Every structure is written in C-alpha cells, then in structure tokens.
Regions:
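Subset of outer-membrane beta-barrel
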Residues: 19-453
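Bacterial Sec-dependent N-terminal signal peptides
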Residues: 1-23, 355
C-alpha cells in the first residue's frame, strides 16, 4: 500500500490530473466542441458551420492535506498526508478529448467525439488507518494505542475508460429577444480497468507491540470489524502506481452506455451576441460493466476477536489490490466472501449550471456550479467533486483571456489563468494560487481545434 500513496504524493510535484476540466474555456464566447462537452445544447450555437477537434487534454491533482509550502520546505509528503486531523481525500484524474467533428445544419447542431478518462481517488481515508497500514506506524501515540470507530466507507479507487459520443442539439424556441436550445449526447462506453478497496464501518484498536520477539515494535490491530470490498479488473489488478497501468488499458471493449442532457437560454443582444446566457446540463447518466477472466468484486467481513491480532506491518510495501487481498486472506481474518465475476460501475453523474453575463463590450463574467448527484462512498461509484467558480473574461474575437476563481470541495479556493488564440488554448485553474498561496491543487490544460465556413 505504501507504493500507492507514494505515487499520489509524487504527482503533486507536477501539474497533473483535474475534476473541473477546461475551466473557463468550456464557457468561451467562441462556441465549439469543448462547450458541448459541458452542455450538448451548445452545439446549436457553434461559431462556424464545421469544427474539427484535433486533441485536448486536462491534467490535475487536488487534495486536502499537502500544500505547495510542504514541497518548498522539503517536508516528507508521505508522512504529511497522515499527520493531521480529519480524513484524507485525494482526487487525481485526466481527461483526453481525442479527435472529433461538429457541424451545424439549419437549426441543428451535430457532433461525433471521442474521449479517454483516467481517475484515481482516495475517499475519506482515516489518517490513523493510513499511517498504520501504509507507513507501519501509529499516528498519534507511538507507544500506546489508537482506537478507530469510523463509520464512513473509506476507499482507494482507480478507473480508466473510453467514450464514443454522438451529440445533437436543436433550437427549440426563438423570438426577437429570446432563444432556447436543447441537446443530448449518447455515449458508448469502453471500460478499460478498475480497482477498488473499500472499508466501511471500521472499528478496531491499533497498538505498538511491546512484547519481545520478532514482532517487537510492530503495529498490531485487534478487536476489529469492517465491511471490506475488493474489486479489480484489467491492468489495475496488480498495480496502480505506474503510468503504464492506466495508459495501457484506456479503451476496453464496448460494455456500457451513458447520456448527457442539456438546455440553454439566451437573452439576445446586438448582432449575434447575447446579454445573458444561462445553461443547465446533467452529465454522465449511466454505468459500465466490467467483465473478463481476471475480474472480481468481492465483499468480505473483517473480524479480529480478542486475543487474536493482525500484524499490520505485513501490508507495508503491498503493490496492488490483489496483493493486499492476498495478505488479508493469509491472515485468516476475512470471512463470508460474496463474489461477482461481472460488476457495474456508475459514472460520476453531475449537474452543471452556468450563467454568462455581458458586463460591458468585450467583458463577460461567467458563474459556474458543478454539483455531484451521487455519494462518493459507494464502492461501485466513480467519484466527482462539487465546484463553484466565477470567471471574468475579455473576448476580442481571435483572442480571449480569462481568470477562473473557484472553490473546490477537496482543495479549497483556487485561482487560475488561461487564454485562447484562435483555436489554440492554454490554461490552469490554479496557477495563481500555486505561485502566491499554499494551494492544494495543481493543474494544466491545453488543446487545439479549428472551425471553417
């Protein structure tokens, strides 16, 4: 398990994997395929009759423990994760928007898009449990004991999958002052790989062994109970601490469907511009099924009754989910396995709401809200985040600059900067807070698309 935490910590050194992907550019005044990824109804508002997307990607990491000051001061990141109060949350993910095309025809807009997704999350992980199982130490009382009554389901999970999307948008209503569009995207899902370790209703006592012998000084767990879920498939079964574990299995076989539904309203301004645009969309309604030879989802009961004890240090250095499962099985404390060879995983369904207001000529301000629709605690749920942002932007036709200021439920307040030059864009949701404050998020996104006619 130590390898898993080390890779998450090391990712914080570079701008990597985000949940609020392409913040600022998805509500650009130059409407294109990226806008439709936020809300499919935007396809009817395409700036050009045809648009081709070559490739775009967004990478970010958000956490609630490690700040840039910890890196600058040379702190031990692995220890810093677990040495403070409150559960640990990490969110590491990447979006790859692969080649796609969109076009307008009469009052319709259409698009065919492809995308790949990589996501790793640590959800509500108790720091005492992490310090014991991952570092082989006690968090608070090095020579005493730590009792854990933790009801929440704490998880370490990772997933990769690909998408092929077919989108359509239509003008529903228009008069002299108002216009309304509606749209839908149907997505074919290609699940790549998945891994999950969940421990719900965890209760137990961690103690430093003071009895002389080969286990002297090691951490032991006693009087413990928990509901354990262990699931794995594909390349993430043996390890999810290497980049190749994800990229080698980004697209699997077709085995799922999902949908995005959206609507937008515009209060017309002069020419083709608007005074106000309001949009709403529900994204990622659906699930995908993982199946294969090396494919399992197992629910266990962990029971350690007095005077039995589990030597926790045996788990330090575990490389992957199967390795962790085997160590638990070797201990003899896992009971009543409920096994599935095929299992469904729910996509991170979210509600997107936004309003773009024209302040003066060339200056707009966008308000954006992302609200997750499902709890992250379920073992079959790919995680998401609640986000609110305010983005002032200057639009000069060929050139656009914007400043996204957001609040993220994991990493807190962030401020970034981005620009668009024709079809090329580059930005970050957190670059300003990264260089001026103790930010707990780092990210980067870029891409290129072009339109004609």
């Amino acid at each position: 398990m130590k390898k898993i935490t080390l890779i998450l910590c090391s990712l914080f050194f570079i701008p990597t994997f985000a949940q609020d992907h392409f913040s600022g550019i998805t509500t650009s005044k130059r409407v294109g395929i990226l806008n439709a990824s936020l809300n499919p109804s935007e396809l009817s508002n395409l700036d050009s009759k045809f648009e081709v997307q070559l490739m775009s990607f967004s990478l970010n990491v958000a956490n609630n423990k490690i700040g840039f000051s910890d890196i600058a001061n040379g702190n031990n990141l692995e220890n810093r994760v677990f040495d403070s109060a409150g559960p640990v949350s990490f969110n590491v993910d990447a979006d790859f928007l692969l080649p796609g095309v969109a076009f307008k025809l009469l009052n319709w807009g259409f698009a065919v898009t492809t995308a790949g997704h990589i996501k790793t999350s640590v959800v509500d992980f108790d720091p005492n449990v992490g310090e014991a199982f991952i570092n082989g130490a006690l968090n608070s009382i090095s020579s005493g004991s730590t009792k854990i009554p933790y009801i929440n389901n704490q998880r370490i999970t990772a997933a990769t999958w690909g998408e092929l999307g077919f989108s359509a948008s239509h003008k529903i209503f228009e008069n002299e002052k108002n216009i309304i569009h509606g749209g839908v995207t149907l997505k074919l899902l290609f699940p790549g790989s998945y891994a999950n370790i969940g421990a719900g209703n965890f209760q137990g006592t961690f103690t430093t062994n003071t009895t002389s012998g080969p286990d002297f000084g090691k951490i032991i767990l006693s009087n413990a109970n928990a509901d354990i879920n262990i699931a794995y498939t594909g390349g993430l079964a043996n390890s999810f601490s290497n980049t190749s574990d994800y990229t080698n299995s980004l697209f699997g076989n077709l085995n799922g469907m999902a949908a995005d539904l959206g609507i937008n309203y515009q209060l017309k301004g002069a020419g083709k511009s608007y005074k106000l645009k309001i949009g709403a969309a529900v994204k990622n309604i659906g699930s995908m099924t993982f199946k294969g030879d090396d494919n399992y989802s197992k629910n266990y009961k962990l029971e350690i009754k007095d005077p039995e004890q589990l030597i926790v240090n045996e788990f330090v250095g575990a490389s992957g989910v199967k390795d962790i499962e085997q160590k638990f099985l070797n201990s003899g404390f896992l009971y009543n396995p409920e096994t599935k060879k095929e299992f469904k995983v729910k996509l991170p369904t979210v509600l997107n709401l936004y309003a773009d207001v024209k302040v003066i000529s060339k200056l707009n301000v966008t308000l954006y809200l992302q609200q997750k629709m499902n709890a992250d605690s379920a073992n079959d749920q790919i995680t998401s985040q609640n986000i609110f942002s305010v983005t002032p932007r200057v639009s000069l036709g060929f050139f656009e600059a914007y400043l996204p200021i957001g609040v993220n439920e994991i990493s807190g307040t962030t401020a970034g900067l981005g620009f668009r030059l024709g079809g090329f864009f580059l930005g970050s949701n957190s670059i300003l807070t990264a260089v001026t404050n103790d930010s707990k998020q780092a990210d980067f996104y870029t891409g290129f698309r072009f339109g004609f006619l």
